[in-house]
Amino acid sequence: MIDNNQTCAAGQDSVPYVTCMIYVLEEWLGVEQLEDYLNFANHLLWVFTPLILLILPYFTIFLLYLTIIFLHIYKRKNVLKEAYSHNLWDGARKTVATLWDGHAAVWHGYEVHGMEKIPEGAALIIFYHGAIPIDFYYFMAKIFIQKGRTCRVVADHFVFKIPGFSLLLDVFCALHGPREKCVEILRSGHLLAISPGGVREALLSDETYNIIWGNRKGFAQVAIDAKVPIIPMFTQNIREGFRSLGGTRLFKWLYEKFRYPFAPMYGGFPVKLRTFLGDPIPYDPKVTAEELAEKTKNAVQALIDKHQRIPGNIRSALLDRFHKEQKAH
């Protein structure tokens, strides 16, 4: 009786090429019914893919907690040095920035375009808020590594209530306002970042990349009071990396009621992420806060129109990993 490999070797047309390859692999690996194993593995992949996509966003939170654990260890190790050094946390910041920069390069092929537009002095960076602002974490890492500067950021109040986050927020200079504090930071020559859309934009915006700022113009008044330029910022494909289900009526109501992002997220896709910094909007004492806010919104929208395909597509965003630069759409 002729075995499977002999049948393939005989060149019989009735035996498909793929089937022959399976027979060869069965003999080479010393297993039987390899095709059944492959079918079973494919079935497992089909079953668990939705679960994996729901877990990956929380892996980012896991990385944040690993960062916090590292900072606590670092703090204990250097407890005696703290009384003698004003730069205790610089080593920790550099280590964390290097780790996040490595993650950005491997998982997203992360790039920043327009870094030269950031001045040596103070500036207010205004950015579009993704479902998870992982692009801003990467951007802060780049700023610290390349320029040795910490970019302060205004975070939502709920972030300060997350257990364990206080040390992380302190080390990386996050604040929740008020306006006077933001002006003070800018007048001291620091970089400050604000997303006017905040959590609402994170939850309610989608693959159409609609900007949800409402009538917010406080950030513009901050720039006017501090007499600093505004730099618009947008990250290509940020909505394809992570998606939010916050657009449903239930989760909208929950957010408006409790001001807490209850909406689940999915994703963690290794899409290409490119952060683009627009031309600085210079300080002009003749411009009102309303006019400056509208001008800034238009600048961010211009970056979206130039660099982002609408609607966003996860498959295309994955393929962007293999292109040097995406065409303007």
From Swiss-Prot:
Any single GO BP term: triglyceride biosynthetic process
Topological domain spans for side Lumenal: 1-50, 142-329
Glycosylation sites: N5
Record: active site: H129
Residue intervals annotated with topology Cytoplasmic: 72-120
InterPro entries recorded: Plipid/glycerol_acylTrfase
Activity regulation comment: Acyltransferase activity is specifically inhibited by TMX1 at the endoplasmic reticulum, restricting accumulation of triacylglycerol.
Known EC number: 2.3.1.-, 2.3.1.20, 2.3.1.22
Bilayer disposition of the protein: Multi-pass membrane protein
Transmembrane segments: 51-71, 121-141
Catalytic activity reported: a 1,2-diacylglycerol + a 1,2-diacyl-sn-glycero-3-phosphocholine = a triacylglycerol + a 1-acyl-sn-glycero-3-phosphocholine; a 1-O-alkyl-2-acyl-sn-glycero-3-phosphocholine + a 1,2-diacylglycerol = a 1-O-alkyl-sn-glycero-3-phosphocholine + a triacylglycerol; a 2-acylglycerol + an acyl-CoA = a 1,2-diacylglycerol + CoA; an acyl-CoA + a 1,2-diacyl-sn-glycerol = a triacyl-sn-glycerol + CoA
Domain of life: Eukaryota
Pfam families recorded: Acyltransferase
One cellular component term from this protein's GO annotations in UniProt: endoplasmic reticulum membrane
Subcellular location: Endoplasmic reticulum membrane
An example Gene Ontology molecular-function term: phospholipid:diacylglycerol acyltransferase activity
Keywords: Acyltransferase, Endoplasmic reticulum, Glycoprotein, Lipid metabolism, Membrane, Transferase, Transmembrane, Transmembrane helix
Family statement drawn from the similarity comment of this UniProt entry: Belongs to the diacylglycerol acyltransferase family. Highly divergent.
PANTHER family registered for this protein in UniProt: MONOACYLGLYCEROL_DIACYLGLYCEROL O-ACYLTRANSFERASE, TRANSMEMBRANE PROTEIN 68
Function comment: Catalytic subunit of the alternative triglyceride biosynthesis pathway, which mediates formation of triacylglycerol from diacylglycerol and membrane phospholipids. Synthesizes triacylglycerol at the expense of membrane phospholipids, such as phosphatidylcholine (PC) and its ether-linked form (ePC), thereby altering the composition of membranes. The alternative triglyceride biosynthesis pathway is probably required to provide the energy required for rapid growth when fuel sources are limiting. It maintains mitochondrial function during periods of extracellular lipid starvation.
Protein name stated in the entry: DGAT1/2-independent enzyme synthesizing storage lipids
Organism: Mus musculus
